[in-house]
C-alpha cells in the first residue's frame, strides 16, 4: 500500500458564461479528444435551445433535470462466502450528480438527430418532464436496490 496521503478532492472550476460548476462538470462529460471549446459550444447551444422553447432560465431547467435524474440508492456487488450479493447503498451527493450527468450525456449521444446540441437539449427537456432514457435508468437503478433490499445488512 502507498504511504502517501490521499489526494485532495478538486472542485470543478465554474464555467465562464453561466459561472456554474454544474455546466463545467457537464462540459467534462461531453468533452472528446480534448476539444473543450467545442464541448462548451455544444452545451451553450443546448441551453439556448432550452431557453427559446421554454422562455425560462436554462440553468434552472438544467439543475431541475439533474435533480430528477440523480439516483438516491444504487447496488454494489459484495462477495460474501463464495457468493456475490447486490447490496443496496445510499449514493452520496457528488456521485449522484456525476451519475446523472453521465446518464444524460450517454442517452443524448444515443438519440437520433442532427446536432449534439439538439439531442442534449431534448434529453434535458425529457428529464425535466420525467420521460426519456436517463429518468428510466434512474428508475431501473432504484428498482434493483428495492429488489435487493434483503441484503442491505451486508452494507460496508
Curated annotation (Swiss-Prot):
Residue ranges that the Swiss-Prot or TrEMBL entry lists as coiled coil: none
Annotated compartments: Plastid, Chloroplast
Family annotation (InterPro entries): Ribosomal_uS7, Ribosomal_uS7_bac/org-type, Ribosomal_uS7_CS, Ribosomal_uS7_dom, Ribosomal_uS7_dom_sf
Alphabetical list of PROSITE patterns matching this protein: RIBOSOMAL_S7 (PS00052)
Origin: domain of life: Eukaryota
The keyword RNA-binding is annotated on this UniProt entry: yes
Keywords, sorted A to Z: Chloroplast, Plastid, Ribonucleoprotein, Ribosomal protein, RNA-binding, rRNA-binding
GO molecular function: rRNA binding; structural constituent of ribosome
Subunit (UniProt): Part of the 30S ribosomal subunit.
Function: One of the primary rRNA binding proteins, it binds directly to 16S rRNA where it nucleates assembly of the head domain of the 30S subunit.
Family in the record: Belongs to the universal ribosomal protein uS7 family.
Protein name, UniProt field: Small ribosomal subunit protein uS7c
Organism listed in the record: Rhodomonas salina (Cryptomonas salina)
